[in-house]
Amino acid sequence: MARDDVIEVDGKVIEALPNATFKVELDNKHVVLCRISGKMRMHYIRIALGDRVKLELTPYSLDRGRITFRYK
């Protein structure tokens, strides 16, 4: 079920950090700290450096996000 108050943006993974956390550079050159969503973790979807991903940002904190989709 999608939330109404999230902001969906696309970006590119630039750094992998511990505990399934990544630094993602958005299309507008901002860098966001992101974690993998629960469904992606449950289905063992792997994310590597350079992958294009879709993120969800909340309006409350625009420097943290959740990775919800990895483009092929």
From Swiss-Prot:
GO cellular component term of the entry, any: cytosol
Domain S1-like intervals: 1-72
Family: Belongs to the IF-1 family.
Broad class of the protein's primary localization: cytoplasm
Entry keywords, A to Z: Cytoplasm, Initiation factor, Protein biosynthesis, RNA-binding, rRNA-binding
GO molecular function: ribosome binding; rRNA binding; translation initiation factor activity
One Pfam family here: eIF-1a
The protein's role, per its UniProt record: One of the essential components for the initiation of protein synthesis. Stabilizes the binding of IF-2 and IF-3 on the 30S subunit to which N-formylmethionyl-tRNA(fMet) subsequently binds. Helps modulate mRNA selection, yielding the 30S pre-initiation complex (PIC). Upon addition of the 50S ribosomal subunit IF-1, IF-2 and IF-3 are released leaving the mature 70S translation initiation complex.
Source organism (scientific name): Helicobacter acinonychis (strain Sheeba)
Keyword rRNA-binding attributed: yes
Quaternary organization: Component of the 30S ribosomal translation pre-initiation complex which assembles on the 30S ribosome in the order IF-2 and IF-3, IF-1 and N-formylmethionyl-tRNA(fMet); mRNA recruitment can occur at any time during PIC assembly.
Localization per record: Cytoplasm
SUPFAM superfamilies from the UniProt entry: Nucleic acid-binding proteins (SSF50249)
Keyword hit for Protein biosynthesis: yes
Protein name: Translation initiation factor IF-1
